[in-house]
Amino acid sequence: KVIDVKCTSPKQCLPPCKAQFGD
């Protein structure tokens, strides 16, 4: 899965992006 470059931290990401961090 490609990580969204706008997401630098799970805390500031939307749920779909947080999932990319495994959170």
UniProtKB/Swiss-Prot annotation:
Superkingdom, natural source: Eukaryota
Annotated tissue distribution: Expressed by the venom gland.
GO molecular function: ion channel inhibitor activity; potassium channel regulator activity; toxin activity
Entry-linked InterPro entries: Scorpion_toxin-like_sf, Scorpion_toxinS_K_inh
Annotated function: Potent selective inhibitor of Kv1/KCNA voltage-gated potassium channels.
Domain notes: Has the structural arrangement of an alpha-helix connected to antiparallel beta-sheets by disulfide bonds (CS-alpha/beta).
UniProt protein name: Hongotoxin-4
A Gene Ontology term for the protein's cellular component: extracellular region
Family note: Belongs to the short scorpion toxin superfamily. Potassium channel inhibitor family. Alpha-KTx 02 subfamily.
Subcellular location per the Swiss-Prot or TrEMBL entry: Secreted
Coiled-coil segments: none
Alphabetized UniProt keyword annotations: Ion channel impairing toxin, Neurotoxin, Potassium channel impairing toxin, Secreted, Toxin, Voltage-gated potassium channel impairing toxin
